[in-house]
Amino acid sequence: VFADPVPAMYDFMPGVERARTAVSPDLDPDLIVVCDGDVSRTGAVLADNAELFGRVPIVNIDHHVSNPGNGVAAAWVDPGAAATCEQVTLLLPHLGVEHDALGGAIAQLLMAGLVFDTASFAHSNTTPRTLRVASELVAAGAQLPMIARRIYRTKPNAQLRLFGRVLSRLETSVDDRVTWSVVTLADFEAAGATLDQAEGLIDLLAQSATADVVLLFKDLDDGVRISVRTRDGGVDATRLAGAFGGGGHARAAGASHEGPFEAAR
């Protein structure tokens, strides 16, 4: 069960057709496992099932440093993990689950999480342990080249048009150390793109040769969503996002602002 619909870019992943955004009323679990965020990040899943979440023990597995790990039966928060999928890969053998289970489908899914959160193992969050875990997943059947290509190097034309509009209004500070842009609902409509196709925009902006801090503002109906990227050894992105009640990692974080774009900017 996911807090949001699975974006179309992941339609190649095994079992994606089983993804749901609502809990079946017939479900009576003994345990709830919340991954990749604290329980509050489950959004409508929590709001629509408050009685269930209050009654059933919760285990929280996450790698975000901003997660306090509170209010659950057990929490494993490891900011040293590149992705929650790294933690799950380490956990599975202790549960008696082989990495090549389900014909390699589990390895495919876990590798996709590693590839996404490390930008194909290019980010500084990639550690020796991350690479060891990845090698185990490849040995278990994960198709690393295909996964990296589908996540980072395959984009519909509508998404490319959207990127072009956002890049055309790129702004920088006087010293070029801060770079930002905004994507609006009008951009999505003009490009014929969907909201999830803004994925990857912030990483493209972060390729700036001079910027220490990069921001992307998504000006949407329900407010402004802010994505932050910072250079290694520089500003802590969680401190910037924290000013808006957000969080994440030292180099990549996000937040939301209920007011207009100009106020957030």
Label every PLM stretch briefly.
Residues 44-47, 71-73, 228:
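Short amphipathic alpha-helical segments
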Residues 1-11, 28-29, 111, 115-243, ...:
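Hydrophobic helix-and-loop "lid/oligomerization" segment in the mid-to-C-terminal part
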Residues 63-133:
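Short alpha-helices
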Residues 3-6, 61-66:
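Short, polar loop motifs at secondary-structure junctions
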Residues 1-52:
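N-terminal small/polar loop signature for handling phosphorylated ligands or for N-terminal nucleophile
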Residues 30-33, 57-59, 213:
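Structural motif
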